[in-house]
Amino acid sequence: MVRRTLLQAALRAWVIQCWWRSMQAKMLEQRRRLALRLYTCQEWAVVKVQAQVRMWQARRRFLQARQAACIIQSHWRWHASQTRGLIRGHYEVRASRLELDIEILMT
């Protein structure tokens, strides 16, 4: 009788231990998934901020190049109207610089 009671108690203890280990594993997995989700969210936010900054920088460079091209163009037009020469030109705006080829034919 005592032996049976001890076996039942040991079996119940073993069942409780198995349940507790499985609960600990589930809680650990939940914490791991939450940490992964938070990391992914932060990583996505960083990528978005970097993209916005790069877009802003590219736009600023483009606007500066366009403004420089407009100033050069207006000055050359004024010069052409004063000299009555023929101006042929070609310009190309790139990400970091402005390429300008101008040919002036005097009459």
Curated annotation (Swiss-Prot):
Superkingdom of the organism of origin: Eukaryota
UniProt xrefs under Pfam families: IQ (PF00612)
Start and end residues of each IQ domain: 42-71
Gene3D superfamilies hit by this protein: 1.20.5.190
GO MF assignments: calmodulin binding
The entry's keywords: Repeat
Record PROSITE patterns: IQ (PS50096)
UniProt cross-references to InterPro entries, sorted A to Z: IQ_motif_EF-hand-BS, IQCF
Name of this protein: IQ domain-containing protein F6
Organism: Homo sapiens (Human)
